Amino acid sequence: MSTNPKPQRKTKRNTNRRPQDVKFPGGGQIVGGVYLLPRRGPRLGVRATRKTSERSQPRGRRQPIPKARRPKGRNWAQPGYPWPLYGNEGCGWAGWLPSPRGSRPSWGPNDPRRRSRNLGKVIDTLTCGFVDLMGYIPLVGAPLRGAARALAHGVRVLEDGVNYATGNLPGCSFSIFLLALLSCLTVPASAYQVRNSTGLYHVTNDCPNSSIVYEAVDAILHTPGCVPCVREGNASRCWVAMTPTVATRDGRLPTTQLRRHIDLLVGSATLCSALYVGDLCGSVFLVGQLFTFSPRRHWTTQGCNCSIYPGHITGHRMAWDMMMNWSPTTALVVAQLLRIPQAILDMIAGAHWGVLAGMAYFSMVGNWAKVLAVLLLFAGVDAETHVTGGAAARSTLQLAGLFQPGAKQNVQLINTNGSWHVNRTALNCNDSLNTGWIAGLFYYHGFNSSGCSERLASCRSLTDFDQGWGPISYAGGGGPDHRPYCWHYPPKPCGIVPAKSVCGPVYCFTPSPVVVGTTDRSGAPTYSWGADDTDVFVLNNTRPPLGNWFGCTWMNSTGFTKVCGAPPCVIGGVGNNTLHCPTDCFRKHPEATYSRCGSGPWLTPRCLVDYPYRLWHYPCTINHSIFKVRMYVGGVEHRLDAACNWTRGERCDLEDRDRSELSPLLLSTTQWQVLPCSFTTLPALSTGLIHLHQNIVDVQYLYGVGSSIASWAIKWEYVVLLFLLLADARVCSCLWMMLLISQAEAALENLVVLNAASLAGTHGLVSFLVFFCFAWFLRGKWVPGAVYALYGMWPLLLLLLALPQRAYALDTEVAASCGGVVLVGLMAL
């Protein structure tokens, strides 16, 4: 018999209990009863083994053992969450029937939304959602989804490049912000030029002398929104627009002349930086903005009307330019990079000592960003790659509408003591108090227009008045009592009107028509329909946005039309033929706009606001045409109809076009609808110029094709900023960029709203929808400011509060004052 112990089955009782490795989700482990955090460095030797000398040391504080997080559902814009938000299951089952393999979206671990942050969440959600929608298309869903998926990954690669540059390259994040700011300053939000011709002002695209910034022998640097018209001999011709701010004689940049100026610019900036007097040089440079650098070389006129009638542009051409916009831009960048070796040889051969000294100094101090900027600046002056591009407008047009003439009442004009009014016996003032569309005024056949020619005999055209000039003031009095039917008769100031003396409703114009109710003199509403002696209409108010309306119109109990309104504008001039303007009098004074001078329903001398009782108050406007109008007054949107006096065959030259302050509606992808024989101040998106239709008088183009429009613009503000940055003028650079931000505030408004929408979207769909609804109805800084304050984005809130209300033009006096302040401060220190 063996003396060895009998083998036993291993159980929990007889098994040697040795410490087992316990794995936690975070990667840590327990050693000696202490939870140790996971090591981030290289794992060498025996892990978590205490030395003999350390065993006598007191143990550290025990770390709590982490618990595995419970899996949560994916939210909107997160990887793995199907898009769109609604109808995904229905689209999936419907798409599975004709295309079973390409219906369900499946991204896997390569979902671009996994690396998204900030604005990238919005971009990747849109691109990936577009990919998912492509998969729902029957039969061809799979190949289309594959192509769209490749495009989404390409967009993600570009975003990764931007993220790497902003997070790793020193100073690149600020440079991207600077480029975004300069892109906002390229084409202004509203730019148009005015020419004075034979006593009338009219719109043009020709640059005035005040828009010319710098002149070379074969090139002109000018402000955006115009094209130079140069007189050579006995004829004037338009120069070729290379960029929105540079025009040349023959479409080629004169490299020799520009390189001389770049040589001087870089050399002086390098000297200031090397001597550590950058702010001193920058302040002197800013003060020098008050003086002219070079004499005039060319005779610029305004007799060409460059690109005012570009011809018909289809939506296909616009879409083609948009698709082709990236390829020439890439070619332009690559061409400039490949041109650097030749540029270095040209520097040495051409003895450009300023550029060479700048490159040498910036290389020695290790400022490679400035070296690259100087190289690209010198190599880019002979680039001949041009880009034609555009952007689509985001607007909608509602073509359906009902003209509502109202109920039938026989109306006839009567002349009493030289004043025309409606026959009192034909009207029923009690029935007319119903202001709905069912009980309006009368049908066309119920009006006898035999007296209209005599009634309108006292009305005059805008061309019959003298031209105004100088600053605009306001008149104190008003026009006659019984002749408000002509556009040029200024109304009296509004006050309190007894309700018993009014027949029908009282309409006031904001410019949208609104009906004013009866109240007592203290403002408390009454409901006796004006039967009491104490019922009145309180109409005294001021012009929007400070007040409620521009003016009011009603009919008194004897059939006469009465009006009141804000004080009209006095546009200047001498003699007895001057005009007190109650509407937009652009052709007599460019500063007389409707928002500044409007005193009633007249939007222009041809058009007035259409409302249900228009044919009662203005019966001779029965043949006016109706146009859809959208306006913004004080940041508030107004959608209304305008009745315009326009007949086919009338002359509509540039001298005959009025100005209309509209945010026009779209007729097509490339056309806006404006009032007949007028123009709106919004320039075309691609060129920054005014483009009108030559044959159709109520069409203006939102997209235009210039001679050769480059995507990169050169402005004098950029030249000043480049000099200040190269010269290390830190204080002057900050002041100059503050001026640029204030100048670009109008273009930054939409950018601020987009940024606030992105911030709200990162906190969920509900917050995004709430922000969208408020931003749709409330314009201004309140909604983005509330979002920034709610989510704690205090730097953006401070930036938003620092922006001015309106974008003011950057003039030389402001720049010189900033430079003078810095110069005095340096001398005092």
UniProtKB/Swiss-Prot annotation:
Extra facts: Viral particle assembly takes place at the surface of ER-derived membranes in close proximity to lipid droplets. NS2 associates with E1/E2 glycoproteins, NS3 and NS5A, which interacts with the viral RNA and core protein to promote genome encapsidation. The nucleocapsid buds at the ER membrane where E1/E2 glycoproteins are anchored and afterward associate with nascent lipid droplet to acquire APOE and APOC. Secretion of viral particles is probably regulated by viroporin p7.
Sequence motif: Nuclear localization signal, positions: 5-13, 38-43, 58-64, 66-71
TM annotation in the entry: 169-189, 359-379, 726-746, 758-778, 782-803, 814-829
EC number: 3.4.22.-
Annotated positions of the Phosphoserine modification: 53, 99, 116
Chain ranges on the Lumenal side, renumbered to this chain: 190-358, 380-725, 747-757, 804-813
Location of region: CD81-binding 1: 480-493
GO annotation, cellular component aspect: host cell endoplasmic reticulum membrane; host cell lipid droplet; host cell mitochondrial membrane; host cell nucleus; host cell plasma membrane; membrane; ribonucleoprotein complex; viral envelope
UniProt keywords, alphabetically: Acetylation, Apoptosis, Capsid protein, Clathrin-mediated endocytosis of virus by host, Disulfide bond, Fusion of virus membrane with host endosomal membrane, Fusion of virus membrane with host membrane, Glycoprotein, Host cell membrane, Host cytoplasm, Host endoplasmic reticulum, Host lipid droplet, Host membrane, Host mitochondrion, Host nucleus, Host-virus interaction, Hydrolase, Inhibition of host innate immune response by virus, Interferon antiviral system evasion, Ion channel, Ion transport, Isopeptide bond, Magnesium, Membrane, Oncogene, Phosphoprotein, Protease, Ribonucleoprotein, RNA-binding, Thiol protease, Transmembrane, Transmembrane helix, Transport, Ubl conjugation, Viral attachment to host cell, Viral envelope protein, Viral immunoevasion, Viral ion channel, Viral nucleoprotein, Viral penetration into host cytoplasm, Virion, Virus endocytosis by host, Virus entry into host cell, Zinc
Region span, CD81-binding 2: 544-551
Region annotation (Important for endoplasmic reticulum and mitochondrial localization) ranges: 112-152
Basic residues composition bias: residue spans: 7-16, 58-73
Record protein name field: Genome polyprotein
Annotated region (Important for lipid droplets localization), positions in chain: 164-167
Region (Disordered): 2-75
Residue numbers spanned by region HVR1: 385-411
Region (Interaction with DDX3X): 2-59
Top-level taxon in the UniProt lineage: Viruses
Species of the source: Hepatitis C virus (isolate Glasgow)
Carbohydrate attachment residues: 196, 209, 234, 305, 417, 423, 430, 448, 540, 556, 576, 623, 645
GO molecular function: channel activity; cysteine-type peptidase activity; RNA binding; structural molecule activity
Region of interest (Interaction with APOA2), residue spans: 122-173
Propeptide position ranges: 178-191
